Amino acid sequence: MDLGLALGAGGARNISFGHNMTTLNYTLSRGIGKALFPGDEILITQLDHEANRGPWLSLREEGVVVREVALLPDGTLDYDDLRTKINENTRLVAMGFSSNALGTVNEVGLVRELTHKVGAWLLVDAVHYAPHFPIDVNALGVDFLLCSAYKFYGTHIGVLYSRDGLLDRIPVYTLRTQEQHAPYCIETGTLNHAAIAGVKAAVEYISTFGTGETLRARIVSGMERIGEYEHILGREIYRGLKGIKGVEVVGPDFGKGKRVPTVSFTMEGMDPIDVCTLLDRRGICAWDGHFYAVRPIEVLGLLEKGGVTRVGVSLYNTADEVQRLLEAVTDIAEGKLRKE
C-alpha cells in the first residue's frame, strides 16, 4: 500500500482507514478505555485540536485521570510541565504533531522518550503536519499516528497507523462478522473504497515532486521540496504581518525551529470574521475563529474576542499571492479597505 510507504510504516497491516480522523480516534479511545482502570492516567495538551482531546477527556467518566500539558504564551508546549505530570500511572500521551491554529510543531522525539520511559503509549495527531513534512513512523517511534488524506491532496478519509501487534491487544468494539485483527478490527462498516483509491493517487502525486530510485525516496524528497517551498512563503507572510501596524501575529516565530506555514493573527479594533469578509473582497480565502482547536485559543484569551484570523499556504500558492494578502491586510489596517 502506497500510504504505508508514505508514512514509513512496515506495510498495509499497520494502516487502518475510517470515515475521518475523529471517528477513528474515538473508536480507538473506547477500546483503550476498556483496558484501563480507575486511577490510570492519560496526558493530553492545551494545544490540541478537539479531535485529540474530546475522546480522551470522555474517559474521565470511567475514572481515568486526564491531565493537560500547559500551553505557553508563545504558542509552544511547556515541556517542563509535561515532565512534572508524566509518571508511573501514565498509560497514554496524546499530542498533536503540529497545531492547526498556531502553526507550532511539537517535539515528538522528546515526548516519545519521556513516554516510553514510564511504559506508556504515544499517540500523535499528524493531521496538520502530514501536508507539509515527510513522516517516518518507525524513526519517530510512535505507537499510534493519525492523519486525514484530504489534507495532503487526497480524499476525505481518516488514517490510523498502529505499531506492529498493538491494535490486536486493544479491545475495540467490533461486530461478530468483522475481522478481529489489525488493521481491520477498527474499520467498522463498509469503507469508502473510492476514497481509499484517491489516497493512493494523492501519494503518487506527491512523489512526482521528488527524485529517487524507490517510491518511498520520491515521496520523502517530494515532501521535503514542498515543505521548503511552503516555508519560504509562510515566513514571508509571518514577517510581513509583523510589520503592519495594528496586527498581532499569534504563534511561534519562523526563526525558532520547524514550523508549518499556517499563520494566525488579530487586528486591533476588528473582529476576525470581519477581517475574513474584507479579505474575501480581494479574492483571498481566510478563516476565522478557533478551527476546532478551542482550547489553545481559549488559553490565550482570544476565544471571547472571536478567535483569530488564519491564513496558510500550500504547494499551489505563489509569492505574488502572498504580496496580495499583505497588501490587503495593510489596506484594512489603514482603513482603505473597510466595511460599508
Question: Could you say what each language-model-derived stretch is?
Answer:
Residues M1-E340:
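Pyridoxal 5′-phosphate
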